[in-house]
Amino acid sequence: MEDIDIARQAKLQNITNVAEKLGIEENYLEQYGKYKAKISNELYEKLKDKKDGKLILVTSINPTPLGEGKTTISIGLADGLSKINKKAILALREPSLGPVFGIKGGATGGGYVQVAPMEEINLHFTGDIHAITSANNLLSALIDNHIFQGNELGFDKVIWKRCVDLNDRALRKVEICLSGEKNAVPREDGFDITVASEIMAIFCLAEDINDLKRRIGNIVVGYNKNGEEIRARDLKAEGAMTVLLKDAIKPNLVQTLENTPALIHGGPFANIAHGCNSVIATKMGMKLADYCITEAGFGADLGAEKFLDIKCRNLPKTPDAVVCVATIKALKYHGGMPIEDIKEESIEYLEKGIHNLLKHIDNLKNVFGLNVIVGINKYITDTDKEIEYLKNKLEEKGVNISLVEAWAKGGEGAIDLAEKIVDLCEKPANFKYCYELNDTIKEKIEKIATKIYGAEGVEYSDEAEKIIQDLEKNGYGNMPVCIAKTQYSFSDDAKNLLCLEPFKIHVKNVILKTGAGFIVILTGNIFTMPGLPKVPAAEKIDIDENGNIVGCLLYTSPS
């Protein structure tokens, strides 16, 4: 059966029944039909003095283009914990329409471990991302209107970009204000994908609506002729922008196919943004259940590093345990096996690729001081010989492992992982950040590059050098850094999978995000507006005469 058929056959519970499992009274719910609801932020005020549950982070090795199943493992783990009578909840990101219609597909899991209603979550859901797009573009409209109406603030340079939640490379650089009207000042502009926008980052890091408004007001949108900053609050924009987000800021409650509760809220990418769901949803999840399972996008070099160095500075606790997801196909890919041959058995390529997994484990254990288990996401094409080889190699290294068959068996296929996670959460961790906030900007970049990526150093463009000097001079040196880098490699070269030769990280630009509270470091050939592949997933998605969606809304299943 296709994933979409499995999802349609599931017996979902009314969302009020799902909420009841968590002890949420109906008056705290704002229902969007039978199976979705927003949770009033007043609930957190009621629960804030309650002890936090265990926090489990799910991350992975560097992925192949179709992903390795972090969401699948996360959902399977939550269902597995429920099967052994543990109170569990998921705290995941919302899917972006970019990947849904691009190459990767949706982000609601697969097989018998999905969050539902799958089609609605993968498309417009409760409208959060559209609200974020509107807030972002309202600010753009206010900037250009201010300039048109006389430019009282003296804009000389505008750095704020518009956004849209689609992969559209044609919008990376555009010319605007070409109407020829009096006072219209033509200028170069560009679009980011919404999930890489500063509004999305702010949305996911804000503690509450007041913090959201404060952060929005802090956004630097441009500079005057004297090089002085112009902020969103100078345009009196923060109030109207926050109004657009007043409902979006409330976490969304849904369920898995096995009726385990799930909070899905916020969705920044991890390669070009910080890659974690909202702080609000994560904090609420830890109050509502004994085990809160969350994930960070792409590999542990990106999402997990940003979760630990950026998001955890805004959370009351750090992870009690980490699951590092690995697949045999990805390990063979990192061993140099051509992607078209990836389903063929090969111990040779598997052996070469294991170093990628071992580097991620070393980072999580020795750089961050966390308790780690490897979740091997079993694919139909994995052979017994490959599985045994991988398990033996990891056991030789003293690595905790669990073979997970949740895609095919649901929560039942993740019981071993669930039991091991319960034990792992009881072991003390010795968490430490990769860098300290009082390190210089360059020290932060270089610590991540050398400790996490394994680079021998960092090279900076002249433009990046100047921006870093200016940021330090203007008092921004104590901010965390968010490195935008390819997800496919430890290096900034997507084709350098093996990373066996010494390499350097190349910083080409630096962007200050005062509202989000971090500095974005652009490396290699990374773009904040992705493009579509030659054959987009959109070509396979359709709707039949009865109104049923057909085609692939999910990533390719483990086959």
Could you say what each language-model-derived stretch is?
Residues 462-542, 550-553:
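Long, compositionally biased intrinsically disordered regions
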Residues 44-46, 51-56, 80-178, 186-192, ...:
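N-terminal phosphate/diphosphate-binding loop that engages ATP/GTP or pyrophosphate donors
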Residues 367-371, 376, 381-382, 387, ...:
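Hard-cation-handling environments
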Residues 310-328:
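Inter-motif core of Ras-like GTPase G domains
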Residues 555-559:
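Conserved small/polar residues in nucleotide/adenosyl-binding loops
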Residues 336-337, 347-376, 384-387:
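Conserved C-terminal guanine-recognition region of P-loop GTPase G domains, centered on the G4
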Residues 3-60, 85-86:
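Extreme N-terminal, non-catalytic leader segments
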